[in-house]
Amino acid sequence: GSPACLEPCRAKPIGLAVPVRSKFIRRSIVMNQNFTVRKLARCAVVAALYVVLCMALQPFSYGAVQVRVAEALCLLPVFGAEYIVGVVLGCFLANLLGSTIVDVIFGTLATLLACVVTYKLRNVRFKGLAIVPSLPPVLFNAVIIGIEIAVMFPDPSSSAPLWLACITNGISVGIGELISCTVLGVLLVKIVETNTSLRKVFLEA
């Protein structure tokens, strides 16, 4: 062939590739938008649920002796990083509405650290149960909130030294977290993992 017939031959596939590539880009943008919307919706629902549980069970959700049922949601990061935002936001709002500014700061910090480490341990299972991922909320809250209560809200009737008050409060908070996270939270994860409908709600991208 002559050079004259080669030029249109080269131009043809280029012209065909443009609409195909554009269609692929448009589809990718739509998929990413849907993915983002789902994540935002999950964050909003989890945050709202956390606040509602704390407000509805307020006598048990605050103080040195507490079983904050909403803390079971701290196990949700095993299903995805987006749940970290939802749980932390919920904790922040719940503390803002029902506790002091000190608890807003340190309580939210404890929940943030706990959720991040829980996410890192999301694939660890003990006999099929998410027991190991449930431990970070217990430990972080026991240490941080235990110290917070001992330092910022000391018992005026107690003559115990500060270090003992920290340990005592830490144990009290830790027991509550064990009930909320290692019992209720692990149960929540197991129910979601074994239920097809719930898996679609919590895990579908």
Regions found by a protein language model. Give the residues of each.
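Hydrophobic transmembrane alpha-helices
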Residues: 31-85
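Short, Lys/Arg-enriched N-terminal segments with co-localized hydrophobic residues
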Residues: 1-30
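Membrane-embedded alpha-helical hairpins and interfacial helices in multi-pass inner-membrane proteins
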Residues: 59-64, 72, 92-205
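Small-residue packing motifs within transmembrane alpha-helices
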Residues: 40-44, 82, 86, 103, ...
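Small-polar-interrupted transmembrane alpha-helices in polytopic inner-membrane proteins
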Residues: 50, 87-95
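Membrane-helix interface "capping/anchor" motifs
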Residues: 77-87, 123-130
